[in-house]
Design a protein with these regions (language model features):
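Conserved beta-strand signature within the Rossmann-like core of class I S-adenosyl-L-methionine
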Residues: 156-165
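C-terminal alpha-helical "lid/dimerization" subdomain adjacent to the S-adenosyl-L-methionine
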Residues: 165-212
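A conserved beta-strand element that flanks and buttresses the S-adenosyl-L-methionine
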Residues: 132
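Conserved Class I S-adenosyl-L-methionine
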Residues: 198, 202-236
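A short, conserved alpha-helix within the catalytic core of class I
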Residues: 140-151
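Class I SAM-dependent methyltransferase Rossmann-like catalytic core
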Residues: 16-19, 23-49, 53
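N-terminal auxiliary segments of SAM/dcSAM-dependent transferases
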Residues: 1-19
């Protein structure tokens, strides 16, 4: 039987999934999420997995990175700063279905933001070096999530990284308690707990990837972060 809090999360609507949400609330939530990514390790986890594909790349190279569901663009910018220390330039493309989010990603600079559907990426096959999505998959249960993974696999040339949340009551309690001293918006506090209970176990994330036709290497990270990575064509 599904845990009652998982059932509650499954039937709840997060602010970023609400087409009627006020733009100011969306932007405030995105800025809170950027702090969560920094403090709880989401940005670091994604960057670590991207490093696996960047390691063979020589200094002086320029590599394209598409971030699907980029939010405020904080994770690709963190990855670019990390790559720059190794002499690699990342050309950042941020894709969002929410116009306010695309504007917020572009506002801080460094990310070429566009509005499009992650289930139908507007790129040719193997036209982007690296493709990332962070904390997006738990918003897309079932076939929409599998379609996103297939599309990411299609457009990537070197590698794909999916970063999300490892489901845990401790993670839910942690984000709830941290939200007060960090002065999160009330919507972020609620949605943070919803997101945790919509998250995955390592086995579940691997199974979703397999059901989309890709074989991913799944890893745990500090801060209840979970990642999956593979090379295009489905080989981990």
């Amino acid at each position: 039987m599904r845990h009652p809090l998982r059932a509650w999360a499954a039937r709840s609507t997060e602010l970023l999934d609400d087409p009627e949400a006020d733009e100011r609330d969306v932007v405030a939530s995105l800025r809170d999420i950027a702090r969560i990514n920094r403090v709880f390790g989401g940005a670091a986890a994604a960057a670590q997995r991207l490093d696996e594909f960047l390691c063979p790349i020589a200094a002086g190279a320029t590599i394209s990175l598409l971030d699907v569901g980029t939010g405020a663009g904080d994770i690709p910018r963190a990855a670019a700063a990390r790559a720059a220390r190794r002499g690699i330039a990342l050309r950042l493309i941020g894709l969002e279905r929410i116009k306010a989010a695309a504007r917020e990603a572009a506002r801080a600079g460094g990310v070429a933001a566009l509005v499009a559907d992650g289930g139908r990426l507007p790129f040719r096959a193997a036209s982007v070096d690296l493709v990332l999505c962070a904390k997006v998959l738990h918003h897309l249960p079932g076939e929409p999530g599998r379609q996103l993974l297939r599309e990411m696999n299609r457009v990537a040339r070197l590698g794909v990284v999916v970063a999300d949340i490892r489901r845990s009551v401790f993670a839910a309690a942690g984000i709830w308690l941290a939200s007060f001293p960090m002065r999160f918006q009330p919507a972020t506090r609620r949605d943070g707990v919803i997101s945790v209970f919509r998250g995955f176990s390592p086995f579940e994330l691997g199974a979703i990837c397999r059901s989309a036709g890709v074989s991913a290497a799944v890893r745990r990270h500090p801060g209840w972060c979970l990642t999956a990575a593979w090379r295009p064509g489905g080989c981990a």
